From Swiss-Prot:
Transcription factor required for the development of the heart and the spleen. During heart development, acts as a transcriptional activator of NPPA/ANF in cooperation with GATA4. May cooperate with TBX2 to negatively modulate expression of NPPA/ANF in the atrioventricular canal. Binds to the core DNA motif of NPPA promoter. Together with PBX1, required for spleen development through a mechanism that involves CDKN2B repression. Positively regulates transcription of genes such as COL3A1 and MMP2, resulting in increased pulmonary endothelial fibrosis in response to hypoxia. PANTHER family: HOMEOBOX PROTEIN NKX (PTHR24340), HOMEOBOX PROTEIN NKX-2.5 (PTHR24340:SF28). It comes from Rattus norvegicus. CDD domains: homeodomain. Belongs to the NK-2 homeobox family. It comes from the Eukaryota. This is Homeobox protein Nkx-2.5. SUPFAM superfamilies: Homeodomain-like. The gene is Nkx2-5. It is found in: Nucleus. PROSITE patterns: HOMEOBOX_1, HOMEOBOX_2. It holds the Pfam family Homeodomain.
Length: 318
């Protein structure tokens, strides 16, 4: 049933609340009829295209259908509403990496080759521009004549620093620029400074060698002798005082007297015993010796005729 047009629609009235279910049913029926018409319309067109010549439509098959439609009146138009199921989109985006049928792989290769050629051309242009750029040449060194150097040296001895006016005047006289005169004076002052430094270094001489550290033993500490420390520096070997005995005669084969008792000593006068031959004590460290007949005391290899030469046995030098 469809609501009558005479009724007023108030959203908060009791009738509208009660008739809400009926309105929803009518909307659902209208939506269903619209869908059926949309789906059946192509089928009816197809049937009309293939119908036989003797078929004139549903009115000819049912003669009372037109009168029934006239009595019922025109069917109400269904309300427009959005479909329950949205229609599928007509365009699907192509996923990344899917092959494009419209593109040919040969076209991709051609594009890649064109890009590579463009990059190579750009690189060649940049290299050519860098090569064409002229290098900055160094200014040639200014060579002064002997007259100019002589005049500059003479002025430098008089005045080491010049004012701008004096510098311009000297440059005009020497036919130089003010900058050249300025740089020459700067270099000359630096040269004098280096010469003074070298002379000072020559006068000072070479630097002294670094001090060497020598270990010295500590013998006394706080007024007390360091016995423990000095024992470590004792000599590695000891010297005895009585390494040799001096009381023993070095030649035991000979007697105590220089002259043999078999020969006589009458030819020479005897000296006083107290002056020349003191008595030797047993505890004396020195060895006494006597001189007898020099002719009779001879060495085994010498003849007896040599009376002036004799050997003195038992003499020690102290």
């Amino acid at each position: 049933m469809f609501p009558s047009p005479a009724l007023t629609h108030t959203p908060f009235s009791v009738k509208d609340i009660l008739n809400l279910e009926q309105q929803q049913r009518s909307l659902a029926a209208g939506d269903l009829s619209a869908r059926l018409e949309a789906t059946l319309a192509p089928a009816s067109c197809m049937l009309a295209a293939f119908k036989p010549d003797g078929y004139s439509g549903p009115e000819a098959a049912a003669p009372g259908l037109a009168e029934l439609r006239a009595e019922l009146g025109p069917a109400p138009s269904p309300p427009k509403c959005s479909p329950a199921f949205p229609t599928a989109p007509t365009f699907y985006p192509r996923a990344y990496g899917d092959p494009d049928p419209a593109k040919d792989p040969r076209a991709d290769k051609k594009e890649l080759c064109a890009l590579q050629k463009a990059v190579e051309l750009d690189k060649a242009e940049t290299d050519g521009a860098e090569r064409r750029r002229p290098r900055r040449r160094r200014k040639p060194r200014v060579l002064f004549s002997q007259a100019q150097v002589y005049e500059l040296e003479r002025r430098f001895k008089q005045q080491r620093y010049l004012s701008p006016a004096e510098r311009d005047q000297l440059a005009s006289v020497l036919k130089l620029t003010s900058t050249q005169v300025k740089i020459w004076f700067q270099n000359r002052r630096y040269k004098c400074k280096r010469q003074r430094q070298d002379q000072t270094l020559e006068l000072l001489g070479p630097p002294p060698p670094p001090a060497r550290r020598i270990a010295v033993p500590v013998l006394v500490r706080d007024g007390k002798p360091c016995l423990g420390d000095s024992a470590a520096y004792a000599p590695a070997y000891g010297l005895g005082l009585n390494a040799y005995g001096y009381n023993a005669y070095p030649y035991p084969g000979y007697g105590g007297a220089a002259c043999s008792p078999a020969y006589s000593c009458a030819a020479y006068p005897a000296a006083p015993p107290a002056a020349h031959a003191p008595a030797a004590s047993a505890n004396s460290n020195f060895v006494n010796f006597g001189v007898g007949d020099l002719n009779t005391v001879q060495s085994p290899g010498m003849p007896q005729g040599n009376s002036g030469v004799s050997t003195l046995h038992g003499i020690r030098a102290w």
